[in-house]
Amino acid sequence: EGQPDKRVLDQVSKDIPILALHVSGHLACVNSAALELAEIDERTPSPSGGVIGRIGTGNEPSGYLEEAGMLAVQQAVASRIKIDFAGIVQGMQKTYIENGVTTVQDGATSEGDIKTLLAMSAGGQLKIDVVAYPLMPSGGKKIVEENQGICGTYCHRLKIGGYKLVLDGSPQGRSAWMTEPYLGGEEGYCGYPWMSDAEVQSYVKQAVEERRQLLVHCNGDAAGDQFLNAYERAIKETEIEEDLRPVMIHCQTVRNDQLDRMVKLKMIASVFVGHVWYWGDIHMNNFGPTRGNHISPVKDAMDRGLVVNFHQDTPVTKPNMLHSVWCAVN
């Protein structure tokens, strides 16, 4: 029960740094060697938008990390991890094709990623269409400026579709940003945001001014409010009314009043509907029956005339679109 900590991983090795990443990508557990390598100790505060877990009520790091709390360790071990990104892309293409998917999007494209994708594109190695969405806080504007030729236009199966923002964590990991508290655990705990309202407003306005599509990760309804508020304000301030097809990604705990606002913005609801199958029991425990039974509200969105699509957040779950349809129907 509960999340593992460094005491579990220290049984494997106290000398070799170990990083165990949750399948969602939002949580991690590391051993004592990894904490030491990242220079995380009792004096290290939790960063904005993340958590460094502690043992009991003290300050000793437990090895449990959330969101931005993982960054120091990930950066510290990066040079020790040899990742063949091109090889991963080749393998994933095969998996997507086997599941009947011929167009995919990369929702967190880095400068290194786009260079690899460009090389694969030029070499005829892309067998499916790839739409890249660089993260705005991580050099997204630079990537777009340096690759104008593939912005909105395919070149050898590759194009940049717009920008990506991540506003919160995951509901199953209790880091999604909610307006009402989670059940159990710390009283009044609602998760937390990744960025301030001012930061989000700046990025959203930039995307609108550049007339680029914006995909925004919102698992919690508070994150949804932050996105909707920023987009409504950006439209008002810029007076740009053309349909830029903004997308709310995940929509796990989106409320009906938020769906109504999305209609006015012509916002697309991209729903990770497989949550009801993979983590439905966790959501009921975290949110109770009222909110838990409103996870992934596909029909409520469709009844309002919203454009709805499904995704699997691969590699979080396999890219089986028919399973997503089954989850939505049954």
Q: PLM features: what roles do these ranges have?
A:
Residues 21, 106-107, 131-135, 161-168, ...:
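Generic beta-strand/beta-sheet core signal
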Residues 205-215, 222-246, 251, 256-330:
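His/Asp/Glu-enriched, well-ordered alpha-helical/loop segment
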Residues 24-26, 34, 69, 110-111, ...:
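Active-site-proximal loop/turn and secondary-structure-junction residues that shape catalytic pockets
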Residues 129-134, 138-143:
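Active-site-proximal beta-alpha core segment in soluble small-molecule metabolic enzymes
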Residues 122-127, 152-153, 234-242:
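Short helix-capping segments at alpha-helix termini
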